[in-house]
Regions:
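Short coil turns that delineate tetratricopeptide repeat
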Residues: 64, 98-99, 133, 196-197, ...
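TPR alpha-solenoid repeat register
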Residues: 69, 104, 138, 168, ...
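Structural motif corresponding to the intra-repeat A-B loop/turn of tetratricopeptide repeats
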Residues: 46, 80, 115, 151-153, ...
Length: 560
């Protein structure tokens, strides 16, 4: 009903606009077209792009008569992955009145680039500058594309350097790769070994470059030194291809000598940047452009699946996931994991765990990375015995010097702790600290476990103080150190910490319970009962805790 009202108001406002008299409107427009157009806008604003597209298509009569129609229609087409259709619509319907948006000229520039008509591409790009409107990222896109066009036309890198930090450096690496510049290796190495950011993704493209130039042994030497457990999906897949002696797989999906391939990677970078800022709509827009330029690189669609998942659009997530099959082990496993997450949201955690465990057992000789994932799935589902079984497999397959050795011990040790096997738990956690003595979360977990058992309280407090010095904004560590002070009867200090933990994690039942206990000890009993009562309302409160809280609400702390 509300949507109908808005549609009526919008139509009324449009009819009364000084730009169009009622007579002019009746001559050139149809109220049905207007209704569909505004319905399209509403659907678009609600992120229902498929529905928006239907409405826009049914109101195409307005395409040359309403300034923003073409812009909304084009944006929706691209969001639906129909980039070529968007380009066609722009070509057929662009006028001086409806062409005042950056993306129209960008798409035309890219279409000309695809056809290697670089002069025409530059003309469209030049026009796009008129509509940047102080949007810094649009300016970066235009300037970077301008530099790529210079490389493609002149076969040399522009002497005019743009100062966009590592963004510019990444693109220069690809430009040098395209030119097969003698310093390409140096540039790739400088990029992937950067101390400031994680640019491990570009190892994949360096491997691609080496294989293209017949340097397979060097590529293999690089992947031999990569750890599956510590590598991204893309790097893991590349490592597997080399182990399986399938270097041709690299060439099938990307080539530095192909202009559209490297520009496609640039737009993936833009998309990834938007996604990291939770701007999923713009991320999807540029990701679809990236995929249009290089549809062979289907692995980039994993970001599109993640974006849809975060927006709770599970239907589109599942559709994208069908792009991945068993031939590419790691992306197939990504598909199964994401499906399991969707099942968890829609059908519950038990069905999700059944699904992932069943499909895991169908995989022959799963990678250690996949074993690690299935262990974590079971641990998170509180199936600790199953999790320990998988952690045992991992520990038997990795060297003690592996960067993740301490992490696996921590995960196995915490699983033992949840089962009440404190001997094995303490052994694993202490050994993990031998490997990484400054790992705050392990210090916190072991110390808190000891506090719960009222064991080595003084040492626990020292460990927690060390953990807090390393991560003083972590709510779990703040709660633990506060609870340690509670156990040694320093309630003032305890309250200072736990109060902050409650502020950081207001929905956590344990933190609220702890705060209630401390307030009771400080003789602030009405407040204590308030926080205990709050625990009963929280979604994550377990049954045993509810029973304990109900007793506290009746009797208070019986040892007070």
């Amino acid at each position: 009903m509300l949507i109908k009202f808005f549609k009526f108001v919008l139509i009324l406002l449009f009819y009364q606009s000084p730009l169009y008299s009622k007579t002019e409107t009746l001559n050139n427009f149809n109220s049905h077209h207007l209704s569909n157009y505004f319905s399209g806008i509403i659907a678009y604003e609600n992120n229902d792009n498929s529905q928006a597209l239907k409405f826009f298509r049914s109101s195409k009569h307005l395409i040359k008569k309403h300034d923003s129609y073409l812009e909304n229609y084009i944006y929706t087409l691209v969001l639906e992955g129909k980039v070529q259709q968007a380009v066609t619509e722009i070509k057929q319907n662009l006028t001086e009145d409806n062409s005042n948006f950056f993306e129209a000229h960008l798409l035309l520039a890219l279409e000309s680039l695809k056809r290697k008509n670089y002069k025409k591409s530059r003309e469209h790009l030049r026009r796009s500058y008129e509509f940047i409107n102080n949007d810094q990222l649009s300016l970066v896109i235009a300037e970077t594309l301008k530099q790529y066009l210079h490389v493609f036309e002149e076969n040399k890198i522009s002497k005019i350097k743009k100062k966009y930090g590592n963004f510019s450096f990444i693109n220069e690496v690809f430009q040098r790769c395209y030119l097969n510049d003698k310093n390409t290796k140096i540039y790739f190495n400088n990029l992937i070994n950067s101390q400031n950011e994680d640019y491990s993704r570009y190892i994949f493209f360096y491997l691609n470059y080496l294989i293209k130039n017949g340097e397979y042994d060097e590529a293999k030497n690089i992947t031999d030194n990569l750890d599956y457990l510590n590598s991204s999906l893309l790097i893991s897949q590349g490592k597997k291809w080399i182990e399986d002696q399938k270097p041709e797989k690299f060439k099938k999906i990307f080539s530095c000598s192909n202009p559209t391939d490297i520009v496609s990677e640039f737009f993936f970078l833009v998309s990834n940047l938007y996604s990291s800022q939770k701007n999923f709509e713009n991320s999807n827009f540029y990701l679809n452009i990236s995929h249009h330029l290089n549809p062979k690189f289907k692995f980039n669609l994993s970001l599109l699946a993640e974006n849809y998942y975060f927006n709770k659009d599970y239907i589109k997530t599942l559709k994208i996931l069908e792009s991945f099959n068993k031939k590419d082990e790691f992306y197939y496993w990504f598909k199964l994991k994401k499906k399991a997450q969707i099942i968890s949201k829609k059908q519950g955690k038990d069905k999700s765990l059944d699904f992932i465990n069943l499909n895991f057992k169908k995989i022959k000789n799963p990678s250690i990375k996949i074993v690690f994932d299935i262990a974590n799935f079971n641990k998170n589902a509180k199936k600790y015995k199953e999790a320990i079984k998988y952690y045992d497999q991992i520990i038997s397959r990795i060297d003690n010097s592996s960067p993740l050795y301490g992490e696996i011990l921590y995960r196995r040790g915490s699983s033992y702790e949840r089962l009440g096997d404190y001997v094995k738990s303490d052994k694993d956690l202490l050994k993990s600290l031998e490997v990484n003595p400054d790992e705050a979360y392990v210090l916190n977990y072991l110390a808190y476990s000891w506090l719960e058992r009222e064991y080595k309280i003084d040492l626990s407090l020292k460990m927690l103080e060390k953990a807090y010095a390393i991560r003083n904004n972590d709510p779990y560590i703040i709660d633990s150190i506060g609870w340690a002070y509670y156990l040694i009867d320093d309630y003032i200090k305890a309250e200072n910490f736990i109060k902050r933990a409650v502020e950081l994690m207001p929905e956590d039942p344990i933190v609220n319970d702890h705060y209630g206990d401390i307030l009771w000890k400080l003789n602030r009993k009405i407040q204590a009962r308030y926080f205990w009562g709050n625990v009963l309302k929280l979604e994550e409160t377990e049954d045993q805790m509810k029973k304990d809280i109900k007793n506290k609400l009746i009797e208070g702390l019986t040892n007070s």
